[in-house]
Amino acid sequence: VSIETGAVRTDAQETFTGEKSMELADSALAALPDILRQCESRELAVFLDYDGTLTPIVARPELAVLADDMRATLDRLAKRCTVAIVSGRALANVQNLVGLDSLIYAGSHGFEIHDPKGGKLHHEEGGEFVPLIAKAAEALKAKLADVEGVIVEPKTYALAVHYRLVSDVDVPRVEAEVDAVVAAEPRLRKTGGKKVFEVRPAMDWHKGRALDWLLQALDLDRPDVLPVYVGDDETDEDAFRVLVDRGLGFIVAERPVQSAASYRLNDTDEVKIFLERLESHGKGEQA
């Protein structure tokens, strides 16, 4: 089954105009009774980032392995409600890491979406950027070859340059090289994250757009549905803003931070506790 982006409603832009001011998110576990009461009266739909949300932040991207007990929690939750992973990782990569056919996967910030029946979405404008990303990746690999610790990770529709293992003195050079590549190609743009610079298509498509599209495509954009999004990074803020007045956003952070999310979970352990509680209170069981 192939789902085309043309199905997105024409007024989708309106979804993003009522942005929530950035405030300190409240503790989710402290507010759990109220959150669960909302789940009892509405159909639940859960959307989750991967890195830093389902797995702890690690030094190298390939080390972010999903724990067996977290996978089991996701599998149980997917029997109760729609569960989707919305990740900056390439679709095939994140799907392989999670390893559950019962989930929906949105990779590359939503440029690639895979549903449980085998359908795949490629944003209709995304294909033209693939060779640009590949060219940028090769250029940065060459320019940064002598920088110890840097990891250039091509992801089809995006490119991540990880500098977590780079010495502080070399980080400005890494950023300068990324900036130079982006400046040379106006169809690309740079975004940031946790110890990473990302090169992405310069178009209005991100996790927030992907979340909005998924809600519509899955017939979950209804008043009786409670969409929940959990994420830990800058790119997840777009999704949090989509759920203002529509659902609940949860940022994963060890200390209070400014966020468009309403609630905060300390770490992946609290994420697991939260998902387990949602599983036991989800409305109905999927066929």
Where are these regions (language model features)?
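Non-catalytic pre-domain segments flanking phosphatase-related domains
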Residues: 1-50, 54, 58, 69, ...
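A general structural motif
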Residues: 41-43, 80, 102, 156, ...
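Active-site phosphate-binding/coordination module
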Residues: 65-155
